[in-house]
Amino acid sequence: MSKYETVIGLEVHAELSTNSKIFCGCPTEFGAPPNTHTCPICLGHPGVLPVTNKQAVEFAMKAALALNCEISRETKFDRKNYFYPDSPKAYQISQFDQPIGYNGWIDIEVNGETKRIGITRLHLEEDAGKLTHSDFGGESLVDFNRVGVPLVEIVSEPDIRTPEEARAYLEKLKAIIQYTEVSDVRMEQGSLRCDANVSIRPYGQEEFGTKAELKNMNSFRNVQMGLEYEVLRQTEVVSSGGKVVQETRRWDEANKKTLTMRSKEEAHDYRYFPDPDLVRMQISEEWIEAVRATIPELPDARQARYVNEFGLSKDDAGVITISKETADFFDETVKTGAEPKSVANWLMVDLLAHLNANNLVFADVKMTPKGLGEMIKLIEDGTISSKIAKTVFKEMVETGKEPKQIVEEKGLVQISDEGALRQVVVDAVNSNPQAVADFKSGNEKAAAFFVGQVMKQTKGKANPGMVNKLIQEVLNSL
């Protein structure tokens, strides 16, 4: 066991799903041609005046309330001064000493234990542009479409002690933000980004160690791997008598290690000052309560409902509710009359396996809740077997066809005619005298052999329960 304790704090940026930017009317649509969603305001031309997007403020309030934050009754925007090619104004409009939300928390669960992670602050700011570095010619290209897109930055307390806890925190945070529908939180499109501050210290020491900031982690898996590597690196440095240098490092996914980006000897002086072009905002109790009323059922409450109302295990309910899309699909399917535990099993096992195997996301699923509900009823009434249902399920997910249509087109109706199945069983028994002898000598596996033979002859369409019953009857009658 290491004699050093890990201390991790996370900074998460989530783009808000407003139709227009935070201080101008330019659209926020992802994937538009470079530099087509810009105007003099977001590009910082002289003489222009920004106007605050009210929906962005309310989305930030909604996220803050969902994360159990207190809301500042008075808040303002500040200029964060720095020069970088992706920031055309040479400053970023952010919030310094009066964030919109503060003193929040979320509960995470790791290895069956619940832990509360504090949230220092949640503040609004504008996004920067996107730089693309060319491998040839030494050129860097900048796309200003993203400049001015509203963000919330969510800063955790340094309460996280392991990379596993960091991943659990991110998954829970993403789920809560997704449930509020203020952001689509898609890391692959950059609408959710995470930086991590990590340090180590001897157990029992109150003072923090020297931290490194990790960037370029574009998935939760990479965040966990990057932190695991960095903790190991810092432990080796300190254990060998060296000192950890305060710096910014990036995760090199190809080589699975962190690399130095730049030294960070001391905190930047961004010379924050209140933006003179934007008025202070007074946030009334009535406004806060109006926003609070728009918050839907959140993951923890939904998980508890699934346990109490449908009898799901806490773990199964947690798997379903970690994604709003999956939870919504579950609810809609149950409304069709399908048995909740069956719905949960199909979603957790078969659907997730299909998505993972094909590198897909839930949005790629063409199956409808109504279709899944009908398929489960086909199993329950004996029209198809559970084995055949897997074939039907896969086609439903890929094509969106209704289950009855698939069953009819492929001739998948389960054979439950006892007379017809008895003849298949008798034929299998007559054709395999050695297996019969094995059964008679007490080898129960021989019965399973005959099940396989019958299923082979019926192309998997025989009713499994009836097949087992008939095999026992025929063999015991010999």
Curated annotation (Swiss-Prot):
Enzyme nomenclature, EC number: 6.3.5.-
The keyword Nucleotide-binding appears for this protein: yes
Reactions it catalyzes: L-glutamyl-tRNA(Gln) + L-glutamine + ATP + H2O = L-glutaminyl-tRNA(Gln) + L-glutamate + ADP + phosphate + H(+); L-aspartyl-tRNA(Asn) + L-glutamine + ATP + H2O = L-asparaginyl-tRNA(Asn) + L-glutamate + ADP + phosphate + 2 H(+)
Database matches in PROSITE patterns: GATB
Source taxon at top rank: Bacteria
Alphabetized NCBIfam families for the sequence: gatB, PRK05477.1-1, PRK05477.1-2, PRK05477.1-4
Source organism of this protein record: Brevibacillus brevis (strain 47 / JCM 6285 / NBRC 100599)
Gene: gatB
Pfam families in the cross-refs: GatB_N (PF02934), GatB_Yqey (PF02637)
Name listed for the protein in its UniProt record: Aspartyl/glutamyl-tRNA(Asn/Gln) amidotransferase subunit B
GO biological process, alphabetically ordered: glutaminyl-tRNAGln biosynthesis via transamidation; translation
GO molecular function: asparaginyl-tRNA synthase (glutamine-hydrolyzing) activity; ATP binding; glutaminyl-tRNA synthase (glutamine-hydrolyzing) activity
